[in-house]
Amino acid sequence: MNISYEGIGALVVTFPGGTCRTGQVCKIGIAGGADKCSSGDKFCGVMLAGEGGVSTVQVEGFVQVGYSGTKPSLGYTVLAADGTGKVAANANGREYLVVEVDTEEMTAIIKL
């Protein structure tokens, strides 16, 4: 049996362009755009698309993210941006619900 969390509780917003790329975790930059996170930054969501000077960012719901470093634990885990568009365990981050981890692809499904 396959389980999918895709689209559950998704809230997607549009921001002016920024420095973030599709699939990366992002933050709201100084100019109000979807900007790439530095290592240790708290992230607001995941960029789904960017074109025409605007960025579409998922800020709530279940979403797949890449991770680096240690595999995130299932359940509530403190995560922050790793500076490459992925997430990593980091005590200075925020707590997210991790429901699935793929160690081969180094991805996790989290609830924003």
Set out the residue ranges of the language-model regions.
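Surface-exposed, low-hydrophobicity beta-strand/loop segments enriched in small/polar/acidic residues
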Residues: M1-L112
